[in-house]
Structure formats: C-alpha cells, structure tokens
Design a protein with these regions (language model features):
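Short Gly/Ser/Thr- and Asp/Glu-enriched loop/turn motifs at secondary-structure junctions
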Residues: 7-11, 51-54, 192-196, 241-245
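Acidic, metal-coordinating catalytic segment for phosphate/diphosphate chemistry
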Residues: 218-316
Length: 316
C-alpha cells in the first residue's frame, strides 16, 4: 500500500516502504518510473527526495535533488555527517527561520554540524520543545509518521498565501480579508457554518502570530469571521514589522439548518446577510470569481485579481 500526505499544493510525501517492490526492484528505480509517468501525463518535470524519514526526504529534495541533472537524491541515516552537517546558513534547514538562526548564531552555532554537537540540555533549556526538535533534526531524526498524519479527525477549509513582496500590517489585513472572503464562500457552498477559526500572520524575517478562537455562534459570513480575526490580530501582531505569509482556516462545522435561538443575535439581519452572500456566490460560480469584488481588492494591497487564473502560484 502507498500512503500519501500532501505537504503543499505541489509537494507531497509518499511512504512506499511496503509497495515499491511491486513496481520496481529498488526505491530509486521506482522513483524514475514515477517521474516518467508524471511527465507523460502532465508534461511537468518533478523532483524527488528519498529518505529514511520525512525530514531527510524533504532535505534531500530541497538541497540536492533540485540541483541534480536527474532530479533525484537519496539521504539515509549514514549520510547525515557528510550531507546534513555541512548545511549552512542555518535558515536553509527545514524548520529554522532567520529569527531562530540569529539566536543560534549567538551561541556559536553556524552549521547543522555545530547544532548536532551543541549540548542537548542547553537547547532544551533555551528553546523548550523546539530545542528538542532542533537536536533530533540535526541528527537526521524525525519521529513523525505519514500514517499518523494521514488521519483527518477534524476537517477544515483553509486558504493561505505567500505575498509577492513585503507588506505592512495594514496592507496585510487587506489580503487577509480576501482570504476570508474565499473560505467563507466555500463554507456556504457546503451549506455549513463554522464555529472555530485559526489564522496566522507571518513576519518577513520569520516567526509570526498564530491564533485560534471559537465563536459564540457558528457563521459563514466573512464580516463576522473578519471581526474576530481583526480583534485578535490588532492585539497580537507587531504593527511595525513587515509581513510575507498569511493563512486562515475554518473548522468545527455545523449544518446551516441547525441554529440555536440567541436573543442577542438579530436573526432577520443574519438571514438577510446570508441571502445576499449566497446571491453573490451564485454570480461568482456562474461568471467567475472576478465578477463581484469588494473595494479593497482594487487597492494596491489587494491580490485577488493577481491570483485569478493561477495554480500553485503559476499562470495556467
């Protein structure tokens, strides 16, 4: 059996431990066949990293395979000293951003080899749980399993975006509203409402704000979702910093027909707003998402029209 776990819209992990032998004699030759089949069906060249775990396979792809003529690289535990420990600067390593890199540099850590040989107890003391992961990853150890990740216990509807240039906080909020507009429409098309919202604002130099909150009443209206997101973002985000990534996801769905009576909610206004939103949804389904837009999407900060017609960030 082959088990897959999607990492992004154009990357995924595959565990073929128990199945590659059905198609080829080695994992490497299996990957060659897979690449050929993908190209024949899509005319797209792909890159493959093979590893003893998810971490090593990802690093093999990012650091070596993308620069190989055959676009395949294989990293095993025995390759850790020669391939992993020479990686520098540190932010090239999966899971280390520039902010963490600066903290590590202050401790005399400039390569993954330095990190691997830095006392474990100090990493744990200074970085907590992340310090434990840094120690394990520097030795090529990744305890996560695709089989564990594959189970979907709480479905969600999400949208994320990597910004094309640095955004101020106020401009980033414009894009966040566009993302919320998208996920709210998708919830309405499923005839559902969402109760829990998770959002993130990622800083240019690494790090950022992540927040999850639960609404008193489930909703599928972007103005109600945005009200909660803006409230928490204004409290948590560093206004003077620049931003490069944004995301929002909705979970804990309930059918539209299930609604508890709330004396503090204007039921007439809520139904009126939902009816208007659904009318716009129908227009966008019929004529395309660009047919109706909010004024913010026409500002310099808006990205909606730039994203129309893109797949995985590429023009189709």
């Amino acid at each position: 059996m082959c088990i897959r776990d999607r990492y992004s819209i154009d990357e995924f992990f595959m565990d073929v431990t128990d199945s590659y032998h059905r198609f080829s004699s080695t994992v490497h030759s299996f990957c060659i066949k897979l690449m050929k089949e993908i190209y024949e069906q899509t005319q797209i060249y792909c890159t493959i990293g093979i590893g003893s775990n998810m971490l090593l396979s990802k690093l093999a792809m990012d650091i070596e395979a993308k620069h190989n003529d055959n676009r395949i690289a294989e990293w095993r535990y025995q390759n850790v000293p020669e391939k992993l420990w020479n990686i520098q600067p540190l932010h090239k390593f999966w899971g280390i951003n520039t902010r963490t890199e600066k903290k590590l540099n202050k401790r005399g850590i400039f390569t993954i080899g330095d990190l691997a040989h830095y006392p474990y107890q100090y990493l744990k003391r200074d970085f907590g749980i992340k310090g434990i992961d840094l120690h394990l990853h520097a030795h090529g150890i990744d305890q996560s399993k695709i089989r564990e990740k594959h189970k979907i216990t709480n479905p969600s509807i999400c949208k994320s975006q990597i910004l094309m240039h640095d955004y101020t906080y106020e401009d980033a909020k414009v894009v966040m509203q566009e993302l919320i507009e998208d996920v709210a429409m998708r919830v309405r098309l499923r005839k559902m409402r969402a109760r829990t919202i998770h959002f993130s604002f990622g800083y240019k130099d690494g790090g950022g704000v992540h927040k999850q909150f639960t609404l008193d009443e489930p909703t599928n209206l972007e103005k109600e979702i945005w009200k909660g997101v803006e409230k928490w973002a204004n409290q948590l985000c560093e206004k003077e910093l620049l931003y490069r990534t944004l995301s929002v996801s909705l979970t804990q769905f309930v059918p539209e027909g299930i609604q508890q009576l709330n004396l503090f909610v204007d039921e007439y206004e809520r139904k009126r707003s939902e009816a208007l939103a659904k009318a716009i949804d129908q227009l966008q389904e019929k004529y395309g998402k660009g047919i109706v837009s909010k004024a913010i999407s026409y500002t310099d900060a808006g990205t909606k029209y730039g994203r129309l017609g893109l797949m995985a960030g590429h023009k189709m």
